[in-house]
Amino acid sequence: MNISGNWEKRRIETFEHLGSIGRSAFARSISNKAVEFILGLFPLLERLVGVPRFSDYPFSLGVASGDPLPDGVVLWTRLAPEPLAEDGRGGMPSGRVFVRWEVADDEGFRRVVRRGMESAGPEMAHSVHVEVGGLQPNRHYFYRFKAGSEISPVGRTKTVPAPGGAVAQMRFAFASCQMYEHGYYTAYGHMSEEDLDLVVHLGDYIYEYGINEYIASSGNVRRHDGPKIFTLPQYRNRYALYRSASNLRAAHAAFPWVVTWDDHEVENNYADGIPGGTGSVDEFLRRRAAAYQAYYEHMPLRRSSVPQGPDMLLRRRITYGNLAEFNVLDTRQYRNDQAAGGGLDPPNPEQRDPSRTITGKAQERWLFEGLGRSRSRWNVLAQQVFFAQRDLRSGPNEVFSMDAWDGYLGSRNRILGFITERGIRNPVVISGDVHNNWVANLKADFDDPDSLTVGTEFVGTSITSGGDGADTNRRAQGIIAENPHIQFFNGQRGYVRCVLTPESFRADYRVLPFVSRRGAPIHTRASFEVSDGQPGAQQVGGEPIPAIPGVDRIPAAIELDGERIEAQQRANRES
């Protein structure tokens, strides 16, 4: 695409003072006729500056929506005709490109209710984040983008109900940990066919390792696109590689997503400005800035989350009528360094230091303020790492993960104390990170099995990380025996589907028999339910995956914390 420098300058000047036509504040301040008038100038602009020409289909990374409100949602795409171009620009020129967008009541776009235009530029990898406003609460909509003569795939999204509005039911799924090399994204194909209002992603969307550095017990089945990543072009290309999977694109296009990160979006086990591996703090902060920018460029996030160098505001709330409120946490960016080196360690003074925090003081205050004001039936903490206490060694000598909330007892005690003292209604924690399914009751005192149960934690397995899993083994059952507040374990891949009503919160553990080959069926391994006003989960259904006729038995292993940490440490040594 050849664009005259003068016209490019005039084009930018014309639209920078308006902001973007898609910005909700501007869209609300002008009439639909004014929008139609400005969009009517688009053919003239294209004749003046040239219709963009792409070397290949520019919407190769698909479309997505996220962070829904009662009157709007964020729409996302990125122009990338050559998504793995070495310079990280996706095959795009250095100039800006107009991208039109439409929102309609119907999939055929006969009833378009909102439309607008964004200017996509190289500073954000030609990504587009449209904050659409003026929509109706609790409604499905269809959306698409246009650039030049090219049209994107159609996405489907949904707004949330009006604040305080009565809601009979909500359905959402949560997922995490999708190491590309460890397996195929079959789970996302099944998820895209579910009837959901929302998807919550709890982190480890990408992995930073080079080719075959982190090897699954069942073997790696795909290859990363290059060595371990450090620079902005490398992080951009890693997201592009993961988005090359059609099942992941389908799940993004099917529902609005609410995303947060864990560690592998930057580097394994980092803590605030402290790298998880070697290197100086300055080097790590440069790397973190590149990683955060690439994350924003590839997620349906609002402009309030635009990174400022190595800092990015990710915590936020999503309220679903009077039924549920989601407090989306960031437990990486503000935490103290992991105690005792950050591995599996016995109790220690650093772990017990009440001043240490996994959320940071400001985010903890924000959480308490939100929980204290909430009038929702279900109060959900969407976060990354295992929240409940989990002694990982049988016998009298305890061992805990210092990277999880077990390494930050002060933070956990303050949250559980606040929930108990303030009588927060129906707290439920959803977590990822550990590549296995767990269910745990949250106790006022984990060392006293008879102490008050104050909440519930549902921990979801990985999409692929760890490779083919297995239902359970002796060591996993030993952990359950050592921790009487833990009710369930499963070591297979998949996601968790949740159904909320005013009376109950049900979590269905949806699992696959394998991810090392394509085409695995989905199965509900277990269903657990929390009743309104009665903290703690009860199993209400599910059974092990039955034998699959005609499918050879696939050798599988369970990757518990020790194996996972060892494999990732080996990956760090390899790199």
Description of each model-found segment:
Residues 2-575:
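Metal-dependent phosphoester/phosphodiester hydrolase catalytic core
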